[in-house]
């Protein structure tokens, strides 16, 4: 028997407002492809009101408890694992209905936050600073708190002036009673409270919390690396449907052919210079190996003809252009393979 079927049977008639809510939820579940589920445990009511006020024109929202949510999902034909839903749907939840990208909508919903004061015993979520400047506080017993917290101050015109910005709490620090009172007196609300989406449903597919907030930059890097590897493989096998791969393969083959010609001494247009250079280098190596014996045998190292400076510069520029062209071909291939990501 399903989770919903195991629920106790109600002896009293269901109130009309609950019946109407159930019908409205069922309609929303049936009408919208994407549903976000935000756990409201420990979330102040005014925070939820702020989110609804900001986004209600874009996204229908409802606050409901577990039992009615599960009944509405069942009635709408959302066939998901009952045991999994039992673990995910807890207490009162804010439901956000939409039809767009669930990941973008999660960011949009969670960015709506309300500044709140801290209470004694709270843990600082971020670094808390008291800025330099004039306050509305008058000197008195509160100066002892400034001393405890090592906040530099001056008295100007009968008011306390904070002489230097001071860090009074770091992430994880427990807020003391003195600090909470001082922050309240200064009107500093260091906590930003909002709703947090626990999971989402997109077209009947469950998206758990660990997947709702992907690292976009890391994902982008992975795609670019994969594209480069794909282009490298396409070049290696000369994959014809990718023109950039064919061009890179031709350049690679030309370089390999030139190296092979120089190695074997094959004379052809464009290989003469490489063959001669290799022969001279090999001769020099033999002369060096023979040492004094070479002079006894009358063998001398041939002096290579000095190339004009302009010719050497042109040759270097040509090589640089070829390298740049090869890099451009590899990078432009990413667009061809992945549609301009």
Swiss-Prot record:
Region (Disordered): 301-341
GO cellular component, one term: cytosolic large ribosomal subunit
Superkingdom of origin: Archaea
One of the GO biological process terms: ribosomal large subunit assembly
Keywords from the named record: Ribonucleoprotein, Ribosomal protein, RNA-binding, rRNA-binding
GO molecular function: large ribosomal subunit rRNA binding; structural constituent of ribosome
InterPro entries: Ribosomal_protein_uL10 (IPR050323), Ribosomal_uL10 (IPR001790), Ribosomal_uL10-like_insert (IPR040637), Ribosomal_uL10-like_insert_sf (IPR043164), Ribosomal_uL10-like_sf (IPR043141), Ribosomal_uL10_arc (IPR022909)
Cysteines joined through disulfide linkages: none
SUPFAM superfamilies: Ribosomal protein L10-like
Stated family: Belongs to the universal ribosomal protein uL10 family.
Subunit organization: Part of the 50S ribosomal subunit. Forms part of the ribosomal stalk which helps the ribosome interact with GTP-bound translation factors. Forms a heptameric L10(L12)2(L12)2(L12)2 complex, where L10 forms an elongated spine to which the L12 dimers bind in a sequential fashion.
Known function: Forms part of the ribosomal stalk, playing a central role in the interaction of the ribosome with GTP-bound translation factors.
Entry protein name: Large ribosomal subunit protein uL10
Originating species: Aeropyrum pernix (strain ATCC 700893 / DSM 11879 / JCM 9820 / NBRC 100138 / K1)
Source organism phylogeny: Archaea, Thermoproteota, Thermoprotei, Desulfurococcales, Desulfurococcaceae
Encoding gene (name): rpl10
């Amino acid at each position: 028997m399903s989770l919903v079927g195991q629920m106790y049977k109600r002896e009293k008639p269901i109130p009309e407002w609950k019946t109407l809510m159930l019908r409205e939820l069922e309609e929303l579940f049936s009408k919208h492809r994407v549903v976000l589920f935000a756990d409201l445990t420990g979330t102040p009511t005014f925070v939820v009101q702020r989110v609804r006020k900001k986004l209600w024109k874009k996204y229908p929202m409802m606050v409901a408890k577990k039992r009615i949510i599960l009944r509405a999902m069942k009635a709408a034909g959302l066939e998901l694992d009952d045991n999994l839903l039992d673990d995910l749907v807890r207490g009162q939840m804010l439901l956000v209905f939409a039809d767009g990208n669930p990941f973008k909508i999660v960011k949009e919903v969670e960015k709506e936050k309300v500044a709140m004061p801290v209470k004694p015993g709270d843990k600082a979520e971020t670094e808390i600073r008291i800025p330099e400047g004039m306050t509305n506080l008058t000197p008195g017993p509160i100066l002892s708190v400034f001393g405890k917290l090592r906040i530099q101050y001056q008295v100007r015109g009968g008011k306390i002036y904070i002489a230097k910005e001071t860090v009074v709490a770091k992430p994880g620090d427990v807020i003391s009673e003195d600090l909470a009172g001082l922050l309240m007196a200064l009107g500093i609300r260091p906590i930003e409270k909002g709703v947090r989406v626990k999971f989402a449903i997109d077209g009947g597919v469950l998206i758990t919390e660990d997947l709702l907030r992907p690292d976009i930059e890391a994902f982008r890097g992975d795609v670019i690396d994969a594209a480069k590897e794909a282009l490298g493989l396409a070049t290696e096998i000369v994959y014809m449907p990718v023109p950039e791969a064919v061009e890179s393969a031709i350049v690679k083959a030309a370089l390999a052919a030139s190296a092979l010609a120089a190695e074997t001494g094959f004379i052809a247009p464009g290989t003469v210079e490489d063959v001669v250079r290799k022969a001279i280098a090999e001769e020099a190596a033999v002369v060096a190996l023979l040492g004094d014996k070479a002079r006894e045998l009358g063998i001398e190292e041939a002096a290579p003809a000095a190339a004009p400076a302009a010719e050497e510069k042109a040759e270097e520029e040509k090589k640089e252009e070829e390298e740049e062209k090869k890099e451009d071909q590899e990078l432009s291939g990413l667009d061809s393979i992945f549609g301009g990501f």
